[in-house]
Amino acid sequence: MASTIMAAASRAVVAKTPFLSGQGRAASASPLRDIAAATNGRITMGNDLWYGPDRVKYLGPFSAQTPSYLNGEFPGDYGWDTAGLSADPEAFARNRALEVIHGRWAMLGALGCVFPEVLQKWVGVEFKEPVWFKAGSQIFSEGGLDYLGNPNLVHAQSILAVLGFQVLLMGLVEGFRINGLDGVGEGNDLYPGGQYFDPLGLADDPVTFAELKVKEIKNGRLAMFSMFGFFVQAIVTGKGPLENLFDHLDDPVANNAWVFATKFAPGS
């Protein structure tokens, strides 16, 4: 059984997937299809089922049944598509890829929004400004912007240089992921794997890989909502997420979404 699963996974992973190319959902686009066939169509994580027709579903308040095109072959498919956004195979393939990529960046972004406040509060790392939406403005100060508050690490004084360097780094990673360069990817532009994208071999086992996909998409969705919450907090309270959390814990009645929503006025 194990050899059958690994063979099926290998055949599926090597095949090129058309996530952003507009080619629709080809037969090779989902490694899970072949894996599920080798395991009688059931891949379970704990006591729950996340794939196939018997998976956990959430239809929402306006859907009577799961659409036929949402058959549970992809991670994070709860059968909910009231607006029919996934009815077109090409749009579905593109939107699914965009969701995964945005979820990954949101997870990194959410960590970056909280981590400086944590370091300054509990580790003792001194930042000129630990709050995420205020930190960038430090580059315009006389001393410039220091990475981790240490001028001996990365000292930035040019906003154009910072933007250019960020575009270069993100572009290289995305280019490697999409093009599948030798030694970088395995031909799958959404889950490239290989020594650079999976150096610990976490996805070597196909069943574990299927579970990790579910965990990734669920945490990615949560991170995207978290980032949206951070944006709203920044506009309404002018404070970072950690400070807002402690304010709420200190006085939940005076510091909550309802109170701020009823008192908020733009520009105040």
UniProtKB/Swiss-Prot annotation:
<keyword id="KW-0812">Transmembrane</keyword>
<protein>
    <recommendedName>
        <fullName>Chlorophyll a-b binding protein of LHCII type III, chloroplastic</fullName>
    </recommendedName>
</protein>
<keyword id="KW-0809">Transit peptide</keyword>
<feature type="binding site">
    <location>
        <position position="177"/>
    </location>
    <ligand>
        <name>chlorophyll b 4</name>
    </ligand>
</feature>
<feature type="binding site">
    <location>
        <position position="86"/>
    </location>
    <ligand>
        <name>chlorophyll a 1</name>
    </ligand>
</feature>
<feature type="transmembrane region" description="Helical">
    <location>
        <begin position="222"/>
        <end position="242"/>
    </location>
</feature>
<keyword id="KW-1133">Transmembrane helix</keyword>
<feature type="binding site">
    <location>
        <position position="138"/>
    </location>
    <ligand>
        <name>chlorophyll a 3</name>
    </ligand>
</feature>
<feature type="binding site" description="axial binding residue">
    <location>
        <position position="233"/>
    </location>
    <ligand>
        <name>chlorophyll a 5</name>
    </ligand>
</feature>
<feature type="transit peptide" description="Chloroplast">
    <location>
        <begin position="1"/>
        <end position="45"/>
    </location>
</feature>
<keyword id="KW-0934">Plastid</keyword>
<dbReference type="GO" id="GO:0009765">
    <property type="term" value="P:photosynthesis, light harvesting"/>
</dbReference>
<comment type="function">
    <text>The light-harvesting complex (LHC) functions as a light receptor, it captures and delivers excitation energy to photosystems with which it is closely associated.</text>
</comment>
<dbReference type="GO" id="GO:0009522">
    <property type="term" value="C:photosystem I"/>
</dbReference>
<feature type="binding site" description="axial binding residue">
    <location>
        <position position="102"/>
    </location>
    <ligand>
        <name>chlorophyll a 2</name>
    </ligand>
</feature>
<feature type="binding site" description="axial binding residue">
    <location>
        <position position="216"/>
    </location>
    <ligand>
        <name>chlorophyll a 3</name>
    </ligand>
</feature>
<feature type="binding site">
    <location>
        <position position="158"/>
    </location>
    <ligand>
        <name>chlorophyll b 3</name>
    </ligand>
</feature>
<feature type="binding site">
    <location>
        <position position="257"/>
    </location>
    <ligand>
        <name>chlorophyll a 6</name>
    </ligand>
</feature>
<feature type="binding site">
    <location>
        <position position="104"/>
    </location>
    <ligand>
        <name>chlorophyll b 2</name>
    </ligand>
</feature>
<feature type="binding site" description="axial binding residue">
    <location>
        <position position="154"/>
    </location>
    <ligand>
        <name>chlorophyll b 2</name>
    </ligand>
</feature>
<feature type="binding site">
    <location>
        <position position="80"/>
    </location>
    <ligand>
        <name>chlorophyll a 1</name>
    </ligand>
</feature>
<keyword id="KW-0604">Photosystem II</keyword>
<keyword id="KW-0148">Chlorophyll</keyword>
<keyword id="KW-0460">Magnesium</keyword>
<keyword id="KW-0597">Phosphoprotein</keyword>
<comment type="similarity">
    <text>Belongs to the light-harvesting chlorophyll a/b-binding (LHC) protein family.</text>
</comment>
<feature type="transmembrane region" description="Helical">
    <location>
        <begin position="153"/>
        <end position="173"/>
    </location>
</feature>
<feature type="binding site">
    <location>
        <position position="264"/>
    </location>
    <ligand>
        <name>chlorophyll b 5</name>
    </ligand>
</feature>
<keyword id="KW-0472">Membrane</keyword>
<feature type="binding site">
    <location>
        <position position="148"/>
    </location>
    <ligand>
        <name>chlorophyll a 3</name>
    </ligand>
</feature>
<feature type="binding site">
    <location>
        <position position="166"/>
    </location>
    <ligand>
        <name>chlorophyll b 5</name>
    </ligand>
</feature>
<dbReference type="InterPro" id="IPR022796">
    <property type="entry name" value="Chloroa_b-bind"/>
</dbReference>
<dbReference type="Pfam" id="PF00504">
    <property type="entry name" value="Chloroa_b-bind"/>
</dbReference>
<comment type="subunit">
    <text>The LHC complex consists of chlorophyll a-b binding proteins.</text>
</comment>
<dbReference type="GO" id="GO:0046872">
    <property type="term" value="F:metal ion binding"/>
</dbReference>
<keyword id="KW-0602">Photosynthesis</keyword>
<feature type="binding site" description="axial binding residue">
    <location>
        <position position="58"/>
    </location>
    <ligand>
        <name>chlorophyll b 1</name>
    </ligand>
</feature>
<keyword id="KW-0157">Chromophore</keyword>
<dbReference type="InterPro" id="IPR001344">
    <property type="entry name" value="Chloro_AB-bd_pln"/>
</dbReference>
<keyword id="KW-0479">Metal-binding</keyword>
<keyword id="KW-0793">Thylakoid</keyword>
<dbReference type="GO" id="GO:0016168">
    <property type="term" value="F:chlorophyll binding"/>
</dbReference>
